[in-house]
């Protein structure tokens, strides 16, 4: 009974956590990777440069 209970709870928790962890990690990884890569490469360089240049040009010119 003890072994069966332990293995059953382990498999259930595990399964639930994997699942959950896999789905959450996949969604979070895809979102974080997309946001980080887009923001760090395109967002920071193009976004920040465009915003800063547009603000400077609008203010100066």
From Swiss-Prot:
It is found in: Nucleus; Chromosome. One of its GO terms (molecular function) is DNA binding. Belongs to the protamine P1 family. One of its GO terms (cellular component) is nucleosome. Protamines substitute for histones in the chromatin of sperm during the haploid phase of spermatogenesis. They compact sperm DNA into a highly condensed, stable and inactive complex. InterPro entries: Protamine_P1. The keyword Nucleus applies. This is Sperm protamine P1. The lineage of its organism: Eukaryota, Metazoa, Chordata, Craniata, Vertebrata. Transmembrane segments: none annotated. The keyword Secreted does not apply.
